From Swiss-Prot, chains A, B:
Binding site for Zn(2+): 188, 198, 201, 204
Native source species: Nitrosomonas eutropha (strain DSM 101675 / C91 / Nm57)
Protein name: 7-cyano-7-deazaguanine synthase
Keywords attached to this entry: ATP-binding, Ligase, Metal-binding, Nucleotide-binding, Queuosine biosynthesis, Zinc
Family designation: Belongs to the QueC family.
GO BP annotation list: queuosine biosynthetic process
Alphabetized GO MF terms: ATP binding; ligase activity, forming carbon-nitrogen bonds; zinc ion binding
Cofactor remark: Binds 1 zinc ion per subunit.
Reactions accelerated catalytically: 7-carboxy-7-deazaguanine + NH4(+) + ATP = 7-cyano-7-deazaguanine + ADP + phosphate + H2O + H(+)
Keyword Membrane among record annotations: no
Keyword Amino-acid biosynthesis tagged: no
Length: 226, 226
């Protein structure tokens, strides 16, 4: 079995990505990065998902970006924006987040002798994020193949972004086909300690709209449905 | 004054790079990454150098790569190779190290509104490292400009690698012109707690040979000269 490093946040997209990697026959090594998020609920969800989907190994890397960054996701003094109030690049954007996470995945892939990295970015719902677009993923892959022993020796690394062109409702349908229980995942930017979602932030809005568009009951634990 | 993020390990190359950035008129923000190195001497040197060269701000980021990697620099069970015993890519290679460090510099540059990152890689002395070559630096820069808000908006980021084509003796001459006291820097892979260099590892060998080739007395504190 070929090994793959899968970036796993515990949200809907990365969980579906892990299920896809597994469904494609890869031995999956999950990597979760705690870059100073405000909610432990996300990492708790990642732990659950790693166990449920039986990854070969699950590593958690702590990297406190709060000393560098001051975005809504890492700085408690900044309010998470309510959906619809921001334009362009969201205020919840963490600088260079995907570049940092892919770099860490690259390091582990090299150690494992893996040539495959999976990341659950999607260009459709999060079009405001520059590092979720196909040209970015291609550029990272090119750089990575010049950065490593393996790439230089012709064992080319592939960055898989299987959701990149899928709208949320198609991601949800794909995940349900693969047997995912989405009530176990947490997408919310400000979930409470038990993993209940706020129902108000951009991530909650996109998730709710996705289940509605897929015409599938939304199993998410929302605080306003408690 | 334009701001620059400068990656600073406290070794000869990164210290010279910082002096060059400063000499070019940049307001310098030093970033040191503790990726699980075995010696605290390197970080102590970085602290000293940051103070001596009067950086605007100096951030230390802790990132324990030892959970992922098992190279000589991070795994205490692996012996640091004595110079001349290894071929091709050195055993002291840390997977994706420069990619990770440049990614963190990219994050800080974006937060600071800086379009300039300095890194002290050199393709001459460390030709075994894939991520020290010009084509790698170019590829990182291309990727970075697709990864960030600033790059997408046309405010292009530049990755400066001013030493990349210089042999060690030219780096040393350049640094002395800029007033660097190289006795304050630590290059050794296994310096002791006080910063005394082993004199035996690849880094020590290259450093010693550099001073010899420059025909300049080597001010390094070597354990075998104690």
């Amino acid at each position: 079995m070929k090994k793959a490093v899968v970036l796993l946040s515990g949200g809907l997209d990365s969980t579906t990505t892990l299920a896809i990697a597994r469904g494609n026959g890869f031995a999956c090594y999950a990597l979760s990065v705690d870059y100073g998020q405000r909610h432990a609920a996300e990492l708790a969800a990642a732990t659950r998902i790693g166990q449920l989907l039986q990854v070969c190994e699950h590593q958690f890397l702590k990297l406190d970006l709060t000393v560098l960054a001051s975005s809504a996701l890492t700085d408690p003094s900044v309010t998470v924006p309510i959906h619809g109030t921001n334009r362009g690049i969201p205020a919840t954007y963490v600088p260079a987040r995907n570049t940092i996470m892919l770099s860490l995945a690259l390091a582990w892939a090299e150690v494992l002798g893996s040539q495959d990295i999976f990341i659950g970015v999607t260009a459709v719902d999060y079009s405001g994020y520059p590092d979720c677009r196909p040209d970015y993923i291609d550029a990272f892959e090119k750089m990575a193949n010049l950065a490593t022993k393996a790439g230089r020796e012709g064992n080319l690394l592939k960055v898989h972004a299987p959701l990149i062109n899928l709208p949320k409702h198609d991601i949800i349908r794909r995940g349900l086909e693969l047997g995912i229980d989405y009530s176990m995942t947490v997408s919310c930017y400000q979930a409470d300690a038990s993993g209940w979602a706020c129902g108000q932030c951009d991530a909650c809005h996109i998730r709710r709209a996705g289940f509605a568009a897929a015409n599938i009951p939304d199993p998410t634990y929302y605080q306003d449905k408690r």
